[in-house]
Amino acid sequence: MGVTICFSFGGGADHPLSDRAFWDEHMRDSLHMPNGGAAVLVNILCLSGGRLAETESQKRMMVYLAEQNQFMYGLGNVDLDIDSLPWDRAHFAEDKAFMLRVIEGARQKLGWETLRDRYEPNAECVKEYLDGYQILMERMTEADIKDESLTKWLDWHKPDQPPKCGFPKCSKHDAYIALDGCQVCTD
């Protein structure tokens, strides 16, 4: 079992899953990794993003990633597809640039010092995961935004939960906290 990251498949008349060209296009730059690799990817993105996020929409991106916690939801039960992130058309260009900075920060091991007591991510695997994630992020366009994703995601949260109650951070890892706490602490 593992996790595949790509552009998700909306189906519908314009892009039926049975259409081989549609399938090939959307899987062109897909990234497959074992469950442990997905957990490491989320952890290092959360560590980097926790230090880089400034705007509300950037912080929302980090809370969304922190919610992709396989320890809490089960192996393989995370959604890391690029177009599933809570994109906001009004901030798309700056949020995409932010996510590319988060990836670069993870490459530079931003925040990894907080992992010393737990583990040291495998540099070779991390490079492969970050390179693949960057390719997918670079492919993301405003046209790929699913307008309902942000609204549905926000509506799913209660007023006393992140991201609606603000953006609390873990005092140990400086990562944004999701519903189930710090992704890095609980992984």
Regions found by a protein language model. Name each.
Residues 47-161:
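Extended alpha-helical interaction scaffolds used for oligomerization/partner binding
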